[in-house]
């Protein structure tokens, strides 16, 4: 390496380090406070639920902050998600329901996709507004279990499992699924599916027998969802904001309070997304409210 090349490499390394440091400091400062408006009683909270729902903690933290803020008269939630983990979706659902029950209005605006778990978290809102072309629905549960025994046989590798009882290694990728395994796992999926149905039936006031006819995992447009009673109205994010402002008695253009994620969450989300893309295929078994 000649001198000129060495100098160039050093300069690039210094610039990368400097940019990374500035970004880190900027994110840290942004995470220290939330974008609060001046007092005046014309504020709405604004929260986004985006991407695969894998962890509820940051969303729940933001929801609680909005619920406690006296300047926030109502909360507008933008959902742009195909769903995700069963537990994470239910925890977000429970927090939204708690806020609504305590008297602070919540309106959901559905984006391009608000399906399965994305729909699940929307159900406790006072009002759901979807775009006519929003992809929603997909009421159902999926469990994925890869079997890699054939691959191991090809490379000459064998895995021995010592277990306490017959069902202890159920779902193992190292052996074929038995009929007993399938029956037990189907029971788990069916139970979680029934929980999903019960939530939608209760929150949307749809009889179970009517709901079961459309809750077969199918996706639908926002317009179709409205016909089935799964959403309340069709409109844009601005329409949802206007409706919420009217519900809160706010005249004129309301100011939005947008919570900023904390720095640890930003990095954790980054690595989760990277892991999902690189190693998602081996994160099994898992059970999800998710549309592919």
Roles of regions detected by a PLM:
Residues 118:
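Pocket-flanking alpha-helical
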């Amino acid at each position: 390496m000649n001198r000129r090349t060495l100098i160039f490499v050093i300069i690039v390394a210094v610039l990368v380090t400097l940019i990374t440091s500035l970004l880190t400091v900027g994110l840290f400062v942004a995470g220290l406070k939330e974008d609060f408006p001046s007092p005046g009683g014309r504020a709405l909270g604004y929260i986004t639920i985006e991407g695969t729902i894998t962890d509820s903690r940051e969303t729940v933290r933001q929801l609680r902050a909005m619920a406690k803020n006296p300047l926030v008269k109502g909360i507008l939630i933008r959902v742009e998600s195909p769903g995700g983990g069963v537990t994470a979706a239910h925890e977000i659902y429970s927090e939204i329901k708690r806020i609504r029950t305590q008297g602070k209005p919540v309106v959901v605006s559905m984006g391009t996709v608000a399906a399965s778990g994305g729909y699940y978290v929307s159900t406790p809102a006072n009002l759901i507004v979807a775009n006519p072309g929003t992809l929603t629905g997909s009421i159902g549960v999926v469990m994925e279990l890869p079997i890699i025994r054939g691959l191991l046989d090809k490379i000459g590798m064998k895995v021995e499992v010592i277990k306490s009882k017959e069902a202890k290694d159920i779902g193992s990728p190292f052996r074929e699924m038995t009929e007993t395994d399938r029956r037990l796992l189907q029971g788990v999926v069916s139970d979680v599916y029934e929980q999903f149905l019960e939530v939608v039936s209760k929150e949307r006031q749809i009889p179970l027998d009517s709901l079961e006819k459309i809750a077969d995992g199918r996706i639908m447009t926002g317009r179709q969802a409205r016909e089935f009673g799964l959403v309340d109205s069709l409109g844009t994010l601005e329409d949802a904001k206007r409706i919420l402002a009217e519900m809160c008695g706010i005249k004129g253009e309301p100011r939005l309070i947008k919570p900023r994620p904390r720095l640890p969450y930003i990095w954790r989300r980054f690595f989760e997304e990277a892991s999902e893309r690189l190693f998602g295929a081996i994160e099994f078994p898992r059970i999800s409210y998710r549309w592919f």
